[in-house]
Amino acid sequence: MIPDSLNRKEIRIDPSSATLETPAAELFDSVVYVPLQTIKQSIFSNIDQMEVTRKCYVILDESLNTIFLFTKDGKFYNKIVNTDKVAEGTFKKIGKFVVDEKREEISFLDPHSFYRFYYSFEGKYLRKMPKVISGEDFYHMSTGLDIYLRSANQILYRSNKAFFESNPTVATSNILVLDSLKKIRYGYLPLDTSTVALDDLYGVAQTFYNNHNGRVTLSIPYNYNIYEIDSIGKMSNTYCFVLPAMNSLPNDFMKNPVYKANRVSYLNNNKNAVYSITDFYQGDKLVTFRLVNALDLHNFLLYNLETAELISMIEIMPDHACFKLPMVQRRIYAAANNHFFISALSASTLFSAKEKLRKDKNWEKQLPQHLKKFYKGDQLQNPVLTLLYLKK
């Protein structure tokens, strides 16, 4: 199917013109710091994926092959790890996980087995089910739909070939929507397999973004559009990015056979060319996103849909809104109800900031009690979440 583009909005930006050193108080009503409890059972280092539910933060550290569960005030209460005493619940590897708020379940595909594993929000093993299809990324909607991203290699290898025998027209779709009976409902964004070679395309860490509005936002590499899929699986094209020529891929980059088997080398030779727009979250009149190119810069940007102002998030100036502390480090991990974005900082980053502020005698006195408690610990504590509450 072709996504509906009737209400698509154009975002025309020049990354080099992004405003620097915008005061935090001009963008955020407040910034709340949530230290994630550090005890022996809860220690982790990387946030590779995070989902926010009404009850908890769900955090995956891929290096530990573990999902950690924290309450909304940062208290650790359980984790999902493959040493479960229930033999049936033993998995080999956590792939991407999804949450079902309605059923209060966490599930993930194990790339090294034939199963999808299900756990409760309390971290209790529930069941495992045979995988229906493999994907580079996937998303679950509370209406029962599962949405899969299939990589170019998976399409070219014709993985899950038998699955498509009843519906061959969607076999080259990058995006598949399956209903609760595991039948294909829709296929979107087909790949022209005649112009793409194996290992021809870079991937990205995440495709689907939960904006908590009953729909899921998504973007795929080599495509400057942002899409949404609604509760019944219909896709719409909501935004289209227009970049300067020096930052853009050729218009025929995915169609022209001259680029076949040469796309990686093209990007290595044209390092300013953006090949993906990731981490797209919307908060009322502001959207945040990251431009990905071969330079591998932390190019987090904030765009005002009303004024068209472009702001570098990494350069936002700390002030009284955030206790003069940094707010963003690696990326934006989530958004909640159009009201705030969520990022995270390492403990060492916050201790470095404290060292720079030590001459300000009144600074520490103004900190909330939970941050004062955090600073009584050391730099080896768990990361600290930052909730960036947007100005109305």
Name each model-derived stretch:
Residues 338-392:
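Blade-level signature of beta-propeller repeat domains, shared across WD40, Kelch, NHL, RCC1
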Residues 121-122, 170-182, 224, 299-307, ...:
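Beta-propeller blade signature
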Residues 47-51, 95-102, 143-152, 201-214, ...:
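Structural signature of eukaryotic scaffold interfaces centered on beta-propeller domains
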Residues 37-42, 46, 66, 75-103, ...:
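Blade-loop segments of beta-propeller domains
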Residues 239-258, 262, 307-337, 351:
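Conserved blade-ending motifs and adjacent loop-strand segments that build the rim/top face
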Residues 39-40, 81-89, 131-139, 191-196, ...:
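Short coil/turn segments at the loop-to-beta-strand junctions that recur within blades
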Residues 110-171, 188-194:
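Asp-box/WD-like beta-propeller blade repeats and closely related beta-sheet repeat scaffolds
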Residues 1-35:
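Blade/loop signatures of beta-propeller domains
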